[in-house]
Amino acid sequence: NNCPLDWLPMNGLCYKIFNQLKTWEDAEMFCRKYKPGCHLASFHRYGESLEIAEYISDYHKGQENVWIGLRDKKKDFSWEWTDRSCTDYLTWDKNQPDHYQNKEFCVELVSLTGYRLWNDQVCESKDAFLCQCKF
């Protein structure tokens, strides 16, 4: 575990919640600039979702939803992670994703679900965000 103090170590990667509010694009750029190889976080198992949810509940200062690295670039419900990892696990909130008004193409953790479930959201909305890095 080479993660800095306030980062969550999990499966060889480190995760950190940032409380400043950014658009999805700005959040991804922030993670990338933080350290080469960093991205908005990706998830691949239920256990990871739970651990992250617990971590965010402990460290997130606001009530806002939290951006993760999933988006629908082609706008056709083909979801992709920014770290190019396999989209093998999805845990949507009820009746999501819905591309509401054909405007929602970025994915956030929903605070009302304890950060366990996902919603597609307008990418220009401002949320807190979760970076994932290797140290």
UniProtKB/Swiss-Prot annotation:
Q: What does this protein do?
A: Galactose-binding protein which recognizes specific carbohydrate structures and agglutinates a variety of animal cells by binding to cell-surface glycoproteins and glycolipids. Calcium-dependent lectin. Shows high hemagglutinating activity (MHC=10 ng/ml).
Which controlled-vocabulary keywords does the entry list?
Calcium, Disulfide bond, Hemagglutinin, Lectin, Metal-binding, Secreted
Q: Which subcellular locations apply to this protein?
A: Secreted
**Motif stretch (Galactose-binding):** 96-98
The protein in question is named C-type lectin Cal
Quick one: which residues bind Ca(2+)? 96, 98, 104, 119-120
Subunit structure comment from the entry: Homodecamer of disulfide-linked dimers arranged in two pseudo-5-fold symmetric pentamers.
Family, similarity comment: Belongs to the true venom lectin family.
* Species classification: Eukaryota, Metazoa, Chordata, Craniata, Vertebrata
One Pfam family hit: Lectin_C
One GO MF annotation is:
metal ion binding
